[in-house]
Regions:
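Bacterial N-terminal signal peptides
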Residues: 9-21
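Active-site-surrounding "flap" and adjacent substrate/cofactor-binding loops of secreted or lumenal enzymes
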Residues: 202-218
Length: 487
């Protein structure tokens, strides 16, 4: 790992240094790297050992795979040929001996009470591992590097896109163990709609949502305050309801409980709280989240009718009123989600309102046939406006390129509203998607937040797949069997 790589890691909070230890004649100053196993996963660790002030040693550690558990060096000591490194407040311990030739440190690695053999080797040049955090999703044999605008375009390869959709959702869920609107949340509110074409979604994702629901149901009533973050509750309810509508075709007890939980934490004005509303477009605006809640209600088989005349029924009407009033919106972007929700929840909007939204979407279509998310709202309109400086500094500000997220979402909304698949404007959008898939199977969308993870590229691939399916441009079943299904 180069020094510039280490500086990069430090800026992202992955690296912590502590200076301790005694002087030893052996020159340990180098970058060292090695692998160990933790819960069946191979994990890689990189150490930078250098001389500090007054002849002491200093050590810096970096896990390449531990995105959410960075290496924090507590102490580093050298005694003769022996070295000892303690990390993360006692969670990790390296005890080793420097080989006679000075090229290896052999010993044991203990992490969370589990001890494994570990050999660290000097690394440099071509042998050094890449900068940490260079991937978007990683879990066992699944690794997707971070998307870039320079990734090569390929001829349409649906299997690559489906593999990414399936594997990315599993990798996020297994690694982070949370419901995230940008990944497994998007999977659960989109993937079931492709059941007829691709087969059922992965049951493991539904099971995870049910487990999350059970944790929510166990939440103490006093903790369900107005500031309670409801994003997860909304996505769990929507994911389970859409699963019922398109996979089992009947309401499950889990879905009924999830919908009850969702309305239990609804705010008095009809929307839901987002505690970290800094991440547009999916985790930044209460109105947009309310459109997801609307999809939950509209999809749950025979559920809404059973709520009439009840307290929950009154809350459903409150949601309708809230959405019809169009409160604080992220420009036209949230109106696209409103049209999608209205198509799945009859009675939310009248035909005239829907046609106005259709016209708005078509007005945003670009010359190349695609749509750009950046034309749908001014920089200050996204979330709390906290990304405006970043967005205004982009070179493409005046002519933003079409992207997978918005092109897919626009086509979904148009088709949901009844615009024919053969409509020339729809076909121009389909043509853009077929020409702009990247080598990894994804469609690229530049993040509105920060140029790092680019998680929007996940919805920016899931949306195009559904859009193509709705336009009759996704191949028949059989082409989309994935590595995930075989694991």
């Amino acid at each position: 790992m180069t020094r510039s790589a280490l500086v990069f890691a430090l800026r992202f909070g992955a690296l912590v240094m502590l200076i301790v230890g005694s002087v030893h004649a052996q020159d340990l100053a180098a970058n060292w790297q090695g692998s160990f196993r933790e819960n069946g996963e191979q994990r890689r660790v990189v150490l930078e050992i250098a001389k500090g002030d007054a002849g002491t040693w200093k050590a810096a550690g970096c896990f390449i795979e531990f995105l959410h558990d960075p290496a924090k060096v507590d102490s580093f000591a050298v005694n003769g040929s022996s070295v000892e490194l303690k990390l993360n407040e006692g969670k990790g311990l390296l005890a080793g001996v420097v080989a006679a030739g000075g090229g290896e440190i052999s010993g044991t690695w203990t992490w969370d009470g589990q001890t494994e053999p570990l050999v660290l080797r000097r690394a440099g040049g071509e042998t050094a591992w890449k900068v940490p955090f260079d991937y978007q999703y990683h879990m066992k044999d699944v690794t997707y590097l971070r998307p870039t605008k320079d990734e090569a375009r390929i001829a349409f390869a649906p299997k690559l896109a489906v593999d990414y959709m399936e594997q990315g959702a599993l990798a996020w869920t297994g690694d982070w163990k949370c419901v995230a609107c940008h990944t497994n949340g998007s999977y659960m509110v989109v993937r079931p709609l492709m059941t007829e074409r691709l087969g059922p979604p992965q049951k493991a994702l539904r099971d995870f949502f049910v487990g999350t629901l059970n944790e929510e149901l166990a939440t103490d009533e006093k903790d369900l305050k107005p500031e309670y973050d409801s994003t997860q509750a909304v996505y769990v309810a929507a994911g389970l309801a859409i699963w019922d509508a398109h996979v089992t075709h009947k309401l499950s007890a889990d879905t009924a409980e999830a919908l009850g939980m969702m309305f239990r934490v609804q705010r008095a004005d009809g929307d839901w709280t987002i505690s970290d509303d800094n991440n547009p477009p999916l985790e930044s605006n209460r109105y947009q989240l309310a459109t997801v809640a609307a999809r939950a209600v509209g999809n749950a088989p025979e559920w809404e009718a059973a709520q009439r005349g009840t307290a929950v029924g009154a809350k459903i009407e409150l949601l309708k009123s809230y959405l019809r009033a169009e409160r604080k919106l992220q420009g036209d972007y949230d109106r696209v989600d409103l049209l999608w929700a209205a198509a799945e929840w009859p009675g939310l909007l009248d035909d005239g309102q829907k046609q106005d939204l259709v016209a708005m979407i078509l007005k945003h279509q670009q010359a190349d046939g695609g749509w750009s998310i950046r034309t749908f709202a001014k920089p200050e309109e996204w979330g709390k406006g906290n990304r405006a400086e970043k967005l205004r500094a982009e070179v493409e500000l005046s002519e933003p390129p079409s992207d997978g997220h918005m092109t897919g979402l626009a086509l979904i909304a148009l088709r949901s509203a009844g615009v024919a698949a053969g409509d020339a404007r729809v076909q121009r959008g389909v043509a853009w998607l077929l020409k702009n898939q990247r080598a990894s199977g994804r469609w690229y969308t530049r993040s509105l937040n920060r140029d790092g993870w680019q998680f929007i590229t996940y919805s920016g691939t899931v949306y195009p797949l559904l859009a193509l399916e709705m336009c009759g441009a996704l191949p028949a079943p059989g082409v989309a069997k994935t590595a995930v299904a075989r694991r």
